[in-house]
Regions:
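A Trp-anchored, charged/polar loop motif used as the substrate-binding/catalytic surface
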Residues: 42-44, 95-105
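Alpha-helical cap/lid subdomain in secreted, periplasmic
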Residues: 1, 75-84, 100-163
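Active-site loop signature of alpha/beta-hydrolase-fold enzymes
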Residues: 66-67, 93, 124, 160
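A short beta-strand-loop structural module common to alpha/beta enzyme folds
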Residues: 82-92
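N-terminal secretory targeting modules
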Residues: 1-60, 64-78
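Phosphate/oxyanion-binding active-site loops and adjacent basic polyanion-contact surfaces
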Residues: 90-95, 132
């Protein structure tokens, strides 16, 4: 009887978990993909910078993060300039692009004290909030695996649209 209960329980669990696993594989927010053109050039420049070492703080994200190089340049210099901070933001990036970049050396051989992550707003036009959260979770997992001593600071996705 105990064996039958275990079999029924395992079958029920499989029926619940399997659709979730299939659904996770169906959306693009978790599938690593590169972009071309200037994006690839910027990605490669990141790899060159981190290869130089001396990285204590890393910012990872999209145009909001990249914006520290434009209008936020003075603030960046004042607060992060002496902190060995590196900006790994690329305008237009979605979770899948950051996943690809992290798999292709953006944080190779560094051990920053903290990684600040803000990504996902560009996914909002084509992914559900749950899918975006899955993409962000993959990024956090990558960082914890590749940078085990680094504190990961996850910032909220800015609200977009009417919903």
């Amino acid at each position: 009887m105990k064996s039958l209960r275990h079999s029924i329980l395992l079958t029920a669990l499989a029926l619940v978990v399997t659709p979730c696993l299939v659904a996770a594989e169906e959306h693009d927010a978790i599938k690593p993909v590169p972009r071309q053109g200037g994006w690839m050039t910027r990605h490669q420049s990141f790899n060159k910078r981190v290869a130089q070492g001396n990285v204590d703080l890393v910012f990872i994200g999209d145009s909001i993060t990249q914006g520290w190089e434009g209008g936020g340049k003075g603030v960046w210099a004042r607060f992060y300039g002496k902190r060995n901070a590196v900006n790994l933001g690329i305008g237009g990036d979605r979770t899948q692009h950051v996943i690809w970049r992290l798999d292709h050396d953006n944080v190779k051989n560094i051990s920053p004290q903290a990684a600040v992550v803000m990504i996902g707003t560009n996914n909002s036009g084509s992914n559900t909030p749950e899918q975006i959260a899955e993409g962000v979770a993959v990024i956090v997992k990558q960082l914890r695996t590749k940078l085990p001593e680094t504190k990961v600071l996850l910032l909220a996705v800015f609200p977009r649209g009417t919903d």
